[in-house]
From Swiss-Prot:
(Microbial infection) N- and C-terminal domains are essential for mediating AAV transduction. Its main location: Golgi. It is found in: Golgi apparatus, cis-Golgi network membrane; Golgi apparatus, trans-Golgi network membrane; Golgi apparatus membrane. The gene is Gpr108. It comes from Mus musculus (Mouse). The chain crosses the membrane at residues 289-309, 318-338, 362-382, 393-413, 427-447, 475-495, 499-519. This is Protein GPR108. The keyword Acetylation does not apply. It comes from the Eukaryota. The lineage of its organism: Eukaryota, Metazoa, Chordata, Craniata, Vertebrata.
Length: 569
């Protein structure tokens, strides 16, 4: 949505600028890692970091490997477990944020009756204490799952909800022995320990308020090497009762008090997987959805081009721009579908295909906003020059679309726990809102112009017909923005986690309906009032009257190329 052809709007051609933006976007993709997440933070001072959110089905698994954690703590601070992870099951579409909580409250100290798992890192005793809250039977064990060969093939989603495979994965004897080893005596060798070598007794007093009724907490080993700490664990969703949307967060409560933050380094790998692949529950149907919608947009574009070829006398440049928009939208959805296919099968996208998706998405967004604004202003249909106000609108919308697409690519390629992830997400929302409001101004100005001209220029019938058409188009644009920005978000919040893909279905269906209605309203037909060019000005009318009265034009005819073909005077 960032780059556009401004030819016809000004005298410059931004080809060099466009390729510069594309080069910048390609370089931005270097950190893209798909659903196998790798996050490295250096000198971080945030107290709470939202690492990731994922929807799990039965037999889904979560693997977390903290390979490096370097803290700048004093000896007194090492005695308290104020650093760790939290895993919670969140409501679908909800946004978890710790920015507004009390600065003196630590999420690792709270008790909860809801589904919650805390991993408390005890630096002094070199152990990780696991506390569970709520009714749950999550299977948590140290280490990572053994790597299995990646299964190729398209994902096979079950849009109705949970997969039909309801059998439960039971822990293997090896995993059970690993859990028992956690309760044996520690084995320490010098200053270097590893999670497999350092074990502590799990005989602890239970939490003061534990709704789950567990008598003791599970303990995992914590490795220590060169002033850094490491450990790993994996979780298996073993029953349908444990399915849902899970949110994983990292907390450093030593930095909760403003002005007393201490920098720390963090390197973590997160691997999330469902039985069908690496996609979240809400993303599994998107592969087929984007493929079907791509075919629908392509079919609509082919039909539109055939209409243009049959009405060559009534076709303007804006009609071909609309055809280019539909084709670009189709190609963008195709690359998006292929991108999800490889993410599901391999855990990460193919970088070249991801770049093509971002480029086509960029062009599609630019063509969309430019086409809506040009139709609303009447360019190419009624006039070939834009007013100063309309030029200012394009001067605002086009740079904002560049910024919006940069924000979109940063969000797609960065990890959720990156320090600037939230900032770019807010920029995308704000810029998109401004662009949606800006494209309405040309339509409103055209409506006012037609209202003023309907009773003054002698062409009341034509202007009233155009006014009615512009009002319909204004309502169409409002409905398009309303459905794709507001209703879609409300739907995403309301539906369960496995139905989150309905958000994308509503957005793409609304876009297709908007394209079809726009093409129907402004099709190159002779009786379309929008395509009827304005008649001669008053001076031409007076000259025509003089020539007619003098008999000079007797037997002559004048041919005008208008939207209704050839007109005989």
């Amino acid at each position: 949505m960032a780059v556009s052809e401004r030819r016809g709007l000004s005298g410059e051609s931004p080809t060099q600028c466009r390729w510069g933006y594309l080069s910048l976007l390609v370089l931005t993709l270097s950190g893209c890692s798909g659903r196998i997440h790798r996050l490295t933070l250096t000198g971080e001072k945030r107290a709470d970091i939202q690492l990731n959110s994922f929807g799990f089905y039965t037999n889904g698994s979560l693997e977390v490997e903290l390979s490096l954690l370097r803290l700048s703590l004093q000896e007194t601070e090492k005695k308290l477990p104020k650093v760790g992870f939290s895993l919670s099951r969140v409501r679908s579409g909800s946004v978890r944020s710790y920015s507004r909580r009390n600065s003196h409250e630590c999420p690792l100290d709270r008790n909860s009756s809801n589904f919650l798992v805390l991993f408390l890192i005890n630096i002094k005793d070199l152990q990780v204490q696991v506390r569970k809250y709520g009714e749950q039977k999550l299977f948590i064990s140290p280490g990572l799952l053994p790597e299995a060969p990646t299964q190729s093939g398209p994902p096979k989603p079950d849009p109705a909800g949970t997969p039909k495979d309801n059998h439960v994965i039971h822990p293997s004897p090896t995993e059970m022995s690993a859990v028992k080893e956690n309760q044996t005596a520690p084995q320490v060798s010098g200053d270097k320990t590893t999670p497999g070598e350092h074990r502590h007794s799990s005989e602890r007093q239970p939490p003061t308020q534990d709704p789950s009724g567990k008598e003791k907490d599970q303990v995992l080993g914590l490795g220590h090497l060169n002033d850094s700490y490491n450990f790993s664990f994996h979780i298996v969703i073993s029953s349908r009762a444990e399915e849902g949307q899970y949110s994983l967060n990292f907390h450093n409560c030593h930095n909760s008090i403003p002005g007393q933050e201490q920098p720390f380094d963090l390197t973590v790998m997160i691997r999330e997987k469902n039985p069908e692949g690496f996609l979240s529950a809400a993303e599994i149907p998107l592969f087929k959805l984007y493929l079907i919608m791509s075919a629908c947009f392509l079919a609509a574009d082919i039909f539109w081009v055939s209409v243009l070829c049959k009405n060559t006398y009534s076709v303007f440049k804006i009609h071909w721009l609309m055809a280019a928009l539909a084709f670009t939208k189709s190609v963008s959805l195709l690359f998006h579908s292929i991108n999800y296919y490889f993410i599901n099968s391999q855990g990460h996208p193919i970088e070249g295909l991801a770049v093509m998706h971002y480029i086509t998405h960029l062009l599609k967004g630019a063509l969309l906003f430019i086409t809506i604004a040009l139709i609303g202003s009447g360019w190419a249909f009624v006039k070939y020059m834009l007013s100063d106000k309309e030029k200012k609108i394009f001067g605002i919308v086009i740079p904002l679309q560049v910024l919006a697409n940069v924000a979109y690519i940063v969000i797609e390629s960065r990890e959720e726990g990156a320090s600037d992830y939230g900032l770019w997400k807010e920029i995308l929302f704000l810029v998109d809102l401004i662009c949606c409001g800006a494209i309405l101004f040309p339509v409103v100005w055209s409506i006012r112009h037609l209202q003023d001209a309907s009773g003054t220029d002698g062409k009341v019938a034509v202007n009233l017909a155009r006014l009615k058409l512009f009002r319909h188009y204004y309502v169409m644009v409002i409905c398009y923005i309303y459905f794709t920005r507001i209703i879609a978000i409300l739907l995403q919040v309301a539906v369960p986690f496995q139905w989150q893909w309905l958000y994308q279905l509503l957005v793409e269906s609304s876009t297709l309906a908007f394209f079809v209605l726009t093409g129907y309203k402004f099709q190159p037909a002779g009786d379309n009032p929008y395509l009827q060019l304005p008649q001669e000005d008053e001076e031409d009318v007076q000259m025509e009257q003089v020539m007619t009265d003098s008999g000079f034009r007797e037997g002559l005819s004048k041919v005008n190329k208008t939207a209704s073909g050839r007109e005989l005077l």
